[in-house]
Design a protein with these regions (language model features):
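Short helix-capping/hinge SLiMs at alpha-helix to coil transitions
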Residues: 18-22, 68-69
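A short alpha-helical element within helix-turn-helix/winged-helix DNA-binding domains
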Residues: 28-35
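Conserved segment of winged-helix/HTH DNA-binding domains
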Residues: 70-95, 106-116
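C-terminal regulatory/oligomerization modules of transcriptional regulators
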Residues: 95-161
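Alpha-helical residues within the helix-turn-helix
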Residues: 32, 49-50
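Beta-hairpin "wing" of winged helix-turn-helix
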Residues: 52-67
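Short coil turns linking two alpha-helices in DNA-binding domains
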Residues: 37-40
Length: 161
C-alpha cells in the first residue's frame, strides 16, 4: 500500500477548499498554490468529481468546490478517489488472485493490516485535518492491542507441502 504523490496533492487541494467551503477555486489556481502541474491537477479534479467529493462548475467564473461538508469526507475516500481501492497485497484486492488462497499463513496478516488501514483512514475526516493540522483525530482503538482482530490458527506451517 503506497499513498501516492497524487493523493498528497489531492489532500492539499481539498484542504484549501475546506478552509472556505463556499469558495469556488479554479483548478489552475489550486495547481499553482500546491505547486503541481496543471494537467496533474486536472486528473486529480476528475477523480474527486467522480467520487462526489467536489463539484466542478464550468465557465469563465467556474472552478471546483466541496460538494459535501469536510466533516463528511474521510481520508480513505480521498485516497480511493484518486488512486483506486486500498490494498495491502495483490491477494487482498477485490479481484485478487492467489494460488495459495485458503492455505497461506500470511493472507490473514495482510487482510488484517488492510482492514486496520482502511478503518484508520475512515476514522479521520478532512475536517479533522483542517481543524487540527498537527494532531489529526485518531480513534483510540488503534492504540489498543486487544482490539486487533483474531485469526484462525495457521495449520499450513507456512511452506509448500
Amino acid at each position: 500500500m503506497d499513498i501516492s504523490r497524487k493523493t498528497d496533492y489531492a489532500l492539499r487541494m481539498l484542504a484549501m477548499l475546506a478552509e472556505d467551503p463556499e469558495r469556488l477555486l479554479s483548478v489552475r489556481t489550486a495547481a499553482e498554490e500546491v505547486n503541481v502541474p496543471y494537467s496533474f491537477a486536472r486528473s486529480i479534479q476528475h477523480g474527486l468529481v467522480q467520487a462526489g467529493i467536489v463539484e466542478s462548475l464550468r465557465g469563465v467564473h467556474g472552478g471546483i468546490r466541496l460538494k459535501v461538508s469536510p466533516d463528511d469526507v474521510t481520508i480513505r475516500q480521498v485516497v480511493e478517489a484518486v488512486q483506486g481501492p486500498m490494498v495491502m497485497n495483490d491477494c487482498t484486492a477485490p479481484d485478487g488472485d492467489c494460488a495459495r488462497m485458503g492455505t497461506c499463513c500470511y493472507h490473514p496478516l495482510w487482510a488484517g493490516a488492510q482492514a486496520l488501514m482502511r478503518d484508520y483512514l475512515d476514522s479521520v475526516s478532512l475536517g479533522d485535518i483542517v481543524a487540527h493540522r498537527q494532531f489529526p483525530a485518531v480513534d483510540s482503538k488503534f492504540a489498543d492491542r486487544d482490539a486487533f482482530p483474531e485469526y484462525a490458527t495457521c495449520t499450513c506451517a507456512c511452506r509448500e507441502e
